[in-house]
Every structure is written in structure tokens, then in C-alpha cells.
Amino acid sequence: MERSAPVQASLWSARMVEWSLMAGVILVLALVFARKLQVVQGQGELAAVQSTLGALRTALVLEHLQKSTVGQGSSVAGTQRNPFELLDRMPANYRGEITRASASSAPPGSWLFDKDCVCVGYVPLYPKWFDSPSGNTVAWYRVSGAPGPLQLLAEEAYVWQDQALN
């Protein structure tokens, strides 16, 4: 009987080492998964931003083409208005007309329009992926263009996860 006690103690300590290693491996895998999930969320937001910018640009071109077929093509450059009004459906995260000064109070993930500068702005949902040369926390796109269709031009060289956001 004296020998069974040390064998049980060594089995118990070996079992604890196994479970500790298993818990460590699971913890490392969970941390790697959480990191990859954040990257994918950032990529999803980038895709949504690019899609909305594409829809706005397309709406501006279609408006120009429509006005040129009616014969109002020369006055298109003077009608710089909110491009969100040209969309069939407003984005769910569009917050309306907000000035640059109060843009920081908009909730993350919001689109906005500043009628004073005729600019479209986006407040990132995950700002850790967004980089602005000036350190601005909002991506601004100026509505401009003459002659021809109005365009959305990035005010800075924005970068999102090492990709140009223009």
C-alpha cells in the first residue's frame, strides 16, 4: 500500500500539467481568434465605406447624365447639393447634415453631410484601422467638379488597414 500513494500523487501532478497545457493552448487560440476577428471587422467596415462612396459617386454621375439629356448639363456644376438625397435609399447610418465642428459628436460608424463646405464625412466605427495624415478622426470627401459630373474627392490621403481610402 505504501507504493500506491506516490503513484497516485505523480498521476495527479501529471494530470494537472496536461490540463494546464490544454488550458494554455485554448487561451492562445482564443486570443488569436479574437485578433483575427477584429481584422475581419475592420475589413468589413472598409468594404461598407467603399460601397457607400461608390453609390454616392454613381448617383452623382447618373444625375449629371440625366440633366445633360434634358439639356441642363451646363448648370450641373452649380448645383452642389447633398449627394445622399440622390440615393433611392439613405444608408441606415446616415445622420443628416452636421457641421465639421460637431462631427466628433456623431456616433461611430456614421455618415454625415456638411452643407457649409459641401462635404461628405464618415466617422469610423473602428478608428484603430483609420489613418489620416492630419490626425483627423473623420474622413472628409469634398463634392466638387466642373465641368462634368460632380465628384467626391478625398481631402487627404486616408489609409485604412494599409489600403488607400479615396
Where are the model-predicted features located?
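N-terminal single-pass transmembrane signal-anchor helix
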Residues: 1-41
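Extracellular/periplasmic head regions of type IV pilus-like filament subunits
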Residues: 64-126
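Intrinsically disordered, low-complexity regions enriched in Ser/Pro/Gly/Gln/His and often acidic
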Residues: 12, 103-106, 153
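Short, surface-exposed interaction loops/tails
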Residues: 119-166
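Membrane-proximal N-terminal amphipathic helix
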Residues: 43-69
